[in-house]
């Protein structure tokens, strides 16, 4: 017997196949007279982010998202046109997005932060996992049923996304011309932006991705003003931290199954700690990620370190020694200098450090300076970090 669900799915996939056959009709204005090529007017002033660019033309915006390894063949291109506007010639491989975006599905808490920063939280209609969100407004929309859970990227509910048909889906990942995980969606006229902000090596570089969201929702002036204020405050704090006479040594994270992942010299965390006036071992390495090292290699540094930060999913020193009793021998453990970034975890387990903290690096930096050099910021109260007891 043919069920109603089977009929629905058959109809849905038939529609998708039909749309795929009529690909030129999917994008707004595609059948209208195409606009002749224009000369660029200006480029967005991106001082810190390396993973994308925005070029402004008279009637549209061109966004490029780059492969972090620098392979230009992997560049993803998007045309942001005014709703109902004509599509310019000369961009055969570009995905087209109508602006201002009125509906978006985000796949990570960072995407919630970008939307919130642009003060456009009402456009969020879907999340990969509803537990990701810390924003008070977004949690309210979730309770009201205005934001749907669409599944993780590895198990994305394509049927639901197709039915919702957002103006854009923001995914997580490095751009690659060889892999198109979202072909079904793009063939159905749903643009997918690969957001790789997590690959930026500096706190301000990661935060500057707010300008991509600004371009999508036509709020560049607002976002630029807010971001400029963050840059000013962040750089003031860096100069303040330079006044410290001593740079305390810092170890981070905990070993996982015998491997201790420590930040490389050009990584996001390494820049944060050095900007806060701390010193870390392996700061002279060139990578932007982590070094997988053995417990035996890291433990001599941990035995003599001044501070231990960014422990992971633990809330107390007892939890730490419950995982490995040897932690009790480390100097920062003995001296009470163990701090974790889990002060702002809500009732569903979302950690706001990864959300609002990502677009407010000046506050994270204030926390780190307060921990490492409390005399420099005597009035500051920790926002994202807490001392583990």
Predicted regions mapped to residue ranges:
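Second-shell loop/turn segments in exported
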Residues: 94, 99-103, 113-114, 146-152, ...
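Extracytoplasmic ligand-binding site segments that recognize negatively charged/polar headgroups
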Residues: 111-112, 127-137, 177-180, 196-211, ...
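A short, structured surface patch at a secondary-structure boundary
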Residues: 64, 69-162, 168-174
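Structured C-terminal subdomain patch of bacterial secreted/periplasmic proteins
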Residues: 27, 108, 200-228, 310-389
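Flexible, glycine-rich surface segments
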Residues: 236-324
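Bacterial Sec-exported substrate-binding components of ABC uptake systems
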Residues: 22-112, 222-251, 371, 375-389
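Bacterial Sec-dependent N-terminal signal peptides
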Residues: 1-29, 368
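Soluble non-cytosolic domains of exported or imported proteins
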Residues: 151-156, 172-179, 200-207, 221-228, ...
């Amino acid at each position: 017997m043919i069920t109603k669900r089977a009929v629905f799915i058959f109809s849905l996939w038939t529609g998708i196949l039909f749309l795929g056959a009529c690909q030129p009709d999917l994008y707004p204005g595609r059948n209208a007279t195409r606009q002749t090529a224009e000369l660029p007017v200006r480029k967005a002033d991106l001082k810190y982010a390396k993973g994308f660019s925005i070029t402004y033309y008279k009637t549209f915006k061109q966004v490029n998202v780059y492969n972090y390894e620098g392979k230009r063949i992997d560049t993803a291109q998007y045309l942001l046109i005014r709703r109902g506007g004509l599509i310019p010639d000369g961009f055969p491989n570009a995905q087209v997005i109508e602006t201002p975006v009125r509906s978006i599905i985000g796949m990570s808490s960072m995407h919630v932060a970008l939307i919130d920063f642009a003060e456009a939280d009402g456009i969020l209609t879907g999340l990969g996992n509803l537990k990701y969100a810390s924003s008070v407004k977004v949690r309210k929309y979730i309770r009201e049923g205005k934001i749907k859970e669409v599944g993780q990227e590895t198990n994305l509910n394509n049927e639901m996304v197709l039915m919702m048909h957002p103006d854009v889906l923001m995914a997580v990942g490095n751009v690659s011309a060889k892999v198109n995980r979202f072909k079904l969606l793009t063939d159905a006229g749903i643009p997918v932006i690969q957001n790789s902000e997590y690959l930026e090596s500096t706190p301000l570089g990661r935060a500057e991705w707010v300008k991509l969201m600004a371009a999508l929702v036509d709020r560049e002036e607002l976002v630029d003003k807010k971001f400029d204020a963050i840059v000013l405050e962040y750089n003031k704090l860096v100069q303040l931290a330079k006044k410290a006479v001593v740079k305390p040594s810092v170890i981070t994270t905990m070993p996982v199954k015998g491997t201790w992942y420590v930040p490389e010299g050009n990584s996001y965390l390494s820049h944060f700690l050095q900007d806060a006036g701390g010193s870390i071992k392996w700061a002279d390495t060139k990578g932007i990620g982590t070094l997988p090292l053995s417990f035996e290699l890291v433990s001599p540094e941990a035995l003599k370190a001044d501070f231990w930060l960014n422990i992971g999913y633990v809330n107390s020193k007892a939890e730490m020694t419950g995982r490995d009793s040897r932690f009790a021998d480390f100097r920062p453990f003995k001296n009470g200098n163990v701090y974790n970034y889990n002060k702002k975890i809500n009732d569903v387990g979302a950690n706001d450090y990864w959300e609002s903290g990502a677009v407010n690096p000046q506050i994270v930096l204030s926390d780190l300076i307060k921990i490492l050099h409390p005399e420099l910021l005597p009035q500051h109260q920790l926002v994202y970090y807490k001392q583990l007891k």
